[in-house]
Amino acid sequence: MSNLKNFLFTSESVSEGHPDKVSDRISDMVVDSFLSGDPFSRVACETLTTTNKVVLAGEVRGPSIKEEDLIQKVRECIKDIGYDQDGFTWREATKIESHLHAQSADIAMGVDSSSNKDEGAGDQGIMFGYACNETEELMPAPIHYSHKILRLMAEDRKSGKLKNIEPDSKSQVTFEYVDGKPTKVKSVVISSQHSADVDQAKVRELLKPYLLKSIPEKFLKDFNEEELYINPTGNFVIGGPDGDCGLTGRKIIVDTYGGAAPHGGGAFSGKDPTKVDRSAAYAARYIAKNIVASNIAEKCLIQLAYAIGVSKPLSIYVDLFDNDLEKNKFVTEKISENFDLSPRGIREMLGLNKPIYEKTAAYGHFGRVPEANGSFSWEKTDKKDVFSK
């Protein structure tokens, strides 16, 4: 984020019913399906969703899964999200194709471990992790509250409490920063698909309460309601994959820090944990979050770089945003001493060879609560004492 002290900063989120997020979820369901049968499966699954059609394509190596079983799981994903519309439904009207095939032997050769070397990275690339003390979850405020608005809407929609609202929604929150700290909300945008029998006044009445439910009152003092934009273009009846084609991996900023930190360009969903696009980004967040949780820095940016077939990162970059070279050196040394950042080391450190990915596909991969089954293990702060001087 900018080194300016006083500024406006905006982040957006999209709901689980957004067409790209439908695709992300289906791709991560495929990852979980293979990892359930073999924790060392290899998966790279892309999903396209459009009007009454879903297409899976990619490379896999692992247990044999019947195509009809995978197709049934796709329908279960669509049903859970909430789609049962003329243009996109979990029922037979939506046609599902699978074009998954075996992983390239050339890629496997570079990644598999052998007797004389550790397993290499699945590809070259750069990955970033970030944390800051703007929220309890150590996430930037704009993306955190953008996610929260949509997550609460989805919970109420699925429970039946929020009626006439359909699965496809977007949010956007602008914060005013003073002396580098978020002080108040400047504007909020909520756009949501709705049933055809409600007008925009009713939609506003239904969705306005989620502003107060999601954002702490201290940030809403003197909020001008004219800056609350709900469905600013009017009717939003046709939505989801029927309104726009969805593809896996197109919401990488929503998935991470809302633009508050750099992104290496690699998407997460549809990839097993040997892919450092995913696992190393999780590790970088884990390190950054523990650094900030230790109170040695108010915010932290980590960059990792890898080469295909090489087990150790080519570089580790640390930015604590305070120009304290001695502290930066101390933190960098502690990372090298306490974190195995080889692909295998990351997977073992965070327990990533588990079917834990489908639930990451919506509302952000970061700022979530670690669960007993290993989900969101990269959000733990169990290494914060490593960075205490």
From Swiss-Prot:
Keyword Transferase recorded:
yes
Q: Give me the disulphide-bonded residues.
A: none
Give EC number(s), comma-separated: 2.5.1.6
GO (cellular component) term, any one:
cytoplasm
Region: Flexible loop; residue ranges are 103-113
- List the transmembrane segments: none
Where is it predominantly found?
Answer: cytoplasm
Q: Which family does it belong to?
A: Belongs to the AdoMet synthase family.
Write the protein's name: S-adenosylmethionine synthase
Q: Which organism does this sequence originate in?
A: Pelagibacter ubique (strain HTCC1062)
Q: Give the gene symbol.
A: metK
